[in-house]
A protein has these predicted regions:
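Domain-level signal for soluble alpha/beta catalytic cores
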Residues: 1-320
Length: 320
């Protein structure tokens, strides 16, 4: 599967055409809702081993809901993580490739039944080092590696995703400026289109405390970065973050926040957020119009969002 073979297009070309795109929603929490036990360091990557066809069905449900981009189940699919299960590196990288094939099969089946549908893309998920630690570090960014160590950690999965034919990389849930620098170098090394999406400490800073303006300057200078944004964040932080990014870059922006609940990394449970989301919107659909006005060209959902949520966002997109 060549990176542009499905429709002869790319994310940047779709954005250049003026399209506003709907990204899919949660994978892991949707799998949990369908009966999967993900209390495991591999998280959704566990299902690649045990029930891969269920992953494909979730991808298909999001395409049916109106998503134009599917994010693969490779967020925590790493040779280092699979090695803890006694899985050899070659077999682990084959599981990374499987995550791409499952999304692509769902796309092809959807297009076979909906031949007039527009281009659909498969984004290869590249989660942060903190996700591998499985201790909530992706919301703090308090781990320290050298640039070389970050690159050596991420390179095998990125190589496997690119070889399997992803249309772009979704470098997502990033809490660390230093890690983003290393990933940008790998994007250049593999000459692959990407988006970069960050977790937040507050509306003006990513989780490690770096101002969003600095993040935007870093990513905005890389031509293979098609969009910059935030994900896996509370709904009420999206608007201030988009404002900060919009003031610092001309790149298209993206946002795919959580459903409105907050995650307790200690108990590994989701809890209702007090105070009506701190004055923010109560749902993706409620926030989407505002986020679009603030420059978000790609909008979707992260943890605890569902195909129903994505369908509501897609309906708003078609009305614009």
């Amino acid at each position: 599967m060549d990176r542009r073979s499905s429709h002869g297009t790319s994310l940047s070309r779709m954005l250049d055409s003026g399209a506003d795109l709907t990204v899919d929603g949660a994978l892991a929490t949707e799998l949990e809702a369908r009966g999967c036990d993900l209390d495991d360091p591999l998280w959704s990557a566990k299902v690649l081993l045990e029930q891969p066809q269920l992953i494909k069905q979730v991808h298909r449900d999001y395409f049916d809901a109106g998503a134009a981009i599917a994010i693969t189940s490779s967020y925590q699919a790493l040779p280092q993580g699979f090695a803890r299960r006694g899985i050899a590196e070659a077999d682990a990288l084959e599981l990374v490739a499987l995550s791409v094939r499952l999304a692509d099969e769902a796309r092809r089946e959807y297009l076979a039944e909906n031949p007039d549908a527009g281009p659909l893309l498969v984004a290869g998920s590249v989660g942060p080092y903190g996700a591998y630690l499985a201790d909530g570090s992706e919301y703090r960014g308090d781990y320290v590696l050298t640039k070389r160590e970050f690159k050596e950690f991420h390179r095998p999965r990125i190589r496997a995703l690119v070889a399997a034919g992803v249309d772009l990389l979704a470098c997502e849930t990033l809490p660390s400026f230093a890690e983003a620098e290393a990933l940008l170098a790998l994007v250049e090394e593999f000459d692959v289109e990407s988006w970069f999406s960050f977790t937040l400490r507050d509306g003006g800073h990513i989780s490690d405390g770096t101002p969003l303006a600095e993040v935007a300057a870093l990513c905005g200078a890389q031509p293979r970065v098609a969009a910059i944004g935030v994900n896996c964040v509370p709904l009420n932080l999206v608007s201030p973050a988009l404002e900060a990014l919009r003031n610092a870059t001309d790149k298209p922006l993206l946002a795919y926040p959580n459903s409105g609940e907050s995650y307790d990394a200690v108990t590994k449970t989701w809890k209702p957020r007090a105070g009506a989301n701190g004055g923010g919107p109560s749902s993706l659909a409620e926030g989407a119009a505002t986020w679009h006005d603030l420059g978000a060209r790609l909008i979707g959902g992260c943890c605890r969002t569902t195909p129903r949520d994505i369908a509501a966002v897609a309906r708003l997109s078609t009305k614009r």
